[in-house]
UniProtKB/Swiss-Prot annotation:
Source species of the chain: Clostridium kluyveri (strain ATCC 8527 / DSM 555 / NBRC 12016 / NCIMB 10680 / K1)
Cellular localization per UniProt: Cytoplasm
EC number assigned by the record: 3.1.11.6
Domain of life: Bacteria
Known function: Bidirectionally degrades single-stranded DNA into large acid-insoluble oligonucleotides, which are then degraded further into small acid-soluble oligonucleotides.
Keyword annotations of the record: Cytoplasm, Exonuclease, Hydrolase, Nuclease
Catalytic activity: Exonucleolytic cleavage in either 5'- to 3'- or 3'- to 5'-direction to yield nucleoside 5'-phosphates
Protein name: Exodeoxyribonuclease 7 small subunit
Origin organism lineage: Bacteria, Bacillati, Bacillota, Clostridia, Eubacteriales
GO BP of this protein: DNA catabolic process
Amino acid sequence: MPRKTETYKSIMLKLENIVASMDSSELSLENSLKSYEEGVKLCNKLYKILNEAEEKIKVLTEEGERDFDIES
């Protein structure tokens, strides 16, 4: 079965839910630590997605600059 890749938006929603639950102060210390750990993992996924997008933009920008160079 193919693995479904998560979108930036879906990961961000999960992270927002974790933050909201931690803000409510209703979690035990153990659950707060688990939530924090999950939040860090989600942040790392978001950073990875953003870094990949940044690299794609750099490549596209560099290719675009080469394609549109006008010789004087």
